[in-house]
Amino acid sequence: MDAVDATVEKLRAQCLSRGALGIQGLARFFRRLDRDRSRSLDSRELQRGLAELGLVLDTAEAEGVCRRWDRDGSGTLDLEEFLRALRPPMSQAREAVIAAAFAKLDRSGDGVVTVDDLRGVYSGRTHPKVQSGEWTEEEVLRRFLDNFDSSEKDGQVTLAEFQDYYSGVSASMDTDEEFVAMMTSAWQL
């Protein structure tokens, strides 16, 4: 294990100590920091952003992380690749149940889930904001999709985005049985 791997392990542990939303919260926070929508951060932005969240990296660690995930030689890290590396690996059982849930949602079978795909399996009619007239059912479906739609809010969720979302959830669950039961119940598999 090299110094950057050790740094990633340190960050992963700090994130996981924050519970289910540790890595997901970090992802949302970094996307807000990325004001130019380049999907990248330099070492100073990374270090400052982590510090705001109470996660500590020294300058050398931040620079090492940026070098590892610098895909184009610009001196910045690729945000999505970095966040993916922070998430712990998943077992085959977890990957399989995520794929099964995605397949159920992808009614058209084209490899992406859209609002049209959701209409048959998710109803927003009973959502409190629909009931109050504040949102339409279409808005509820779109906002639901946005939970999974990671980089570009294009109204389409790929299997990779779905897996990324659930790898963050998976990190907070100790056993495969617990995770599989949650997914099976949530998606009526």
From Swiss-Prot:
Record PTM text: Phosphorylated in response to thyrotropin and cAMP.
Keywords for this protein: Calcium, Cytoplasm, Metal-binding, Phosphoprotein, Repeat
Tissue expression from the record: Detected in thyroid, salivary gland, lung, brain and cerebellum (at protein level).
Domain of life: Eukaryota
Pfam families in the cross-refs: EF-hand_7
Modified residues (Phosphoserine): S40
Record bears the keyword Membrane: no
Protein name: Calcyphosin
Subunit relationships: Monomer. Does not form oligomers in the presence of calcium.
InterPro entries attached to this UniProt entry: Ca-bind_SignalingProt, EF-hand-dom_pair, EF_Hand_1_Ca_BS, EF_hand_dom
PANTHER family found in the cross-reference section: CALCYPHOSIN
Binding positions (Ca(2+) 1): D34, D36, S38, S40, E45
Chloroplast listed as a keyword: no
Any one Gene Ontology cellular component term annotated for this protein: cytoplasm
Organism (species): Canis lupus familiaris
Domain EF-hand: 21-56, 57-92, 93-128, 136-172
Compartment(s) where it occurs, according to its Swiss-Prot or TrEMBL record: Cytoplasm
GO molecular function list: calcium ion binding
Coiled-coil stretches noted in the UniProt entry, renumbered to this chain: none
Primary location: cytoplasm
Gene that produces this protein: CAPS
